[in-house]
UniProtKB/Swiss-Prot annotation:
Has 3 domains, the large (RuvB-L) and small ATPase (RuvB-S) domains and the C-terminal head (RuvB-H) domain. The head domain binds DNA, while the ATPase domains jointly bind ATP, ADP or are empty depending on the state of the subunit in the translocation cycle. During a single DNA translocation step the structure of each domain remains the same, but their relative positions change. It catalyses: ATP + H2O = ADP + phosphate + H(+). HAMAP family: DNA_HJ_migration_RuvB. SUPFAM superfamilies: P-loop containing nucleoside triphosphate hydrolases, Winged helix' DNA-binding domain. DNA binds at R291, R310, R315. It is found in: Cytoplasm. It comes from Xylella fastidiosa (strain 9a5c). The gene is ruvB. Belongs to the RuvB family. It holds the Pfam family RuvB_N. One of its GO terms (biological process) is DNA repair. Mg(2+) binds at T66. This is Holliday junction branch migration complex subunit RuvB.
Length: 343
């Protein structure tokens, strides 16, 4: 399912992100607490001529975890090696990566929660002692040898910290959580991207795009490109607030950043199930969507923004959802009667 507001990166997103990715912390907009902390850690590390402590970065998709890893490596003045958890299938794959690192290099592992247990076992001594144990030979003749590694920094990124094993999580000396961006910070990001991509975008136009980007830079930059297309065909190329609003209407993205599927879900709960609670299977059947799509793609943002709640008896629309749909909240029996309401 292709959604303009999907947080998953498309091939176009990845290509554009490379060209607009900031290099320095000073250009990494938003996430002020993270920037301030990393600036201190990096300066102190460089002064001691050591490898930076291993870093775990977590948060929802599209907030800049990969970008931050590139910035950290640039500020340290070292090379960045990029890979992902699913790619490292065997212990030998990880060993090959680690033994090719230069002193103080940064190894970035995206989706680190998807590392296999066998690979994790190799990673533990590498992170703690800068050594790896490799098995040579097979059967009775097999033996373990230790290989010394240069000091390095591992940066792990994940959207699901709950899936990390405790031993792996405990080996990260620095843990940073990326939060959703404010509309103001997103507007600054849109203006910066517009400047790099030579897009004529007014301050008000950038703010309008940012308002509908669901707190996510990846979505903001994608919307910017689609609004640019609209502006070039319909409005002489300049993105004003009026042009941005017209483009968003064409894209069916409302002021809350909701698309048609978001609104259909809320409308269905409100109109057909009296605001809920309604089971996920019934909801999926009513919308002709798969359960997994609703649970993993649609619901998280609605829940995070307070438009939807999950209870033991099913999904319920909140008063905020009624207000967004310009409807009057109805009297409902509370669904919060089970001690496991939140699951």
């Amino acid at each position: 399912m292709d959604r303009i507001i999907d947080t998953a990166a498309t091939s176009e997103d990845e290509a554009i992100e490379v060209s607009i990715r900031p290099k320095r912390l000073a250009d990494y907009l938003g996430q002020q607490p993270v920037r301030e902390q990393m600036d201190i850690y990096i300066q102190a590390t460089k002064a001691r001529a050591e490898a930076l402590d291993h870093v775990l970065i977590f948060g929802p998709p599209g907030l800049g975890k990969t970008t931050l890893s590139h910035v950290i490596a640039y500020e340290l003045g070292v090379k960045l090696r990029v890979t992902s958890g699913p790619v490292i299938e065997k212990a030998g794959d990880l060993a090959a990566l680690l033994t090719n690192l230069q002193p103080y290099d940064v190894l970035f592992i995206d989706e680190i929660h998807r590392l296999s247990p066998v690979v994790e076992e190799v990673l533990y001594p590498a992170m703690e002692d800068f050594q790896i144990d490799i098995m040579i030979g097979e059967g009775p003749a097999a033996r373990s040898i230790k290989i010394d590694l240069p000091p390095f920094t591992l940066i792990g990124a994940t959207t699901r910290t709950g899936l990390l094993t405790a031993p792996l999580r405990d080996r990260f000396g620095i843990v940073q959580r990326l939060e959703f961006y404010s509309p103001e910070d997103l507007a600054r990001i849109v203006r910066r991207s517009a400047g790099i991509l030579n897009i004529d975008c007014t301050t008000e136009g950038a703010a309008e795009i940012a308002q509908r980007a669901r707190g996510t830079p990846r979505i903001a930059n994608r919307l910017l490109r689609r609004v640019r297309d609209y502006a070039e065909v319909k409005a002489g190329g300049q993105i004003t607030i009026e042009v941005a609003q017209a483009a968003m209407q064409m894209l069916k993205v409302d002021q809350g950043g909701f698309d048609e599927l978001d609104r259909r879900l809320l409308h269905t709960i409100v109109e057909y199930f009296d605001g809920g609670p309604v089971g996920i299977e019934s909801l999926a059947a009513s919308l002709s969507e798969e359960r997994g799509t609703l649970e993993d793609v649609v619901e998280p943002y609605l829940i995070q923004q307070g438009f939807l709640v999950r209870t033991a008896r099913g999904r319920m629309a909140t008063d905020k959802a009624y207000q967004h749909l310009a409807l009057q909240p109805r009297e409902r029996v509370s669904a919060f009667t089970d001690p496991e309401d939140l699951f």
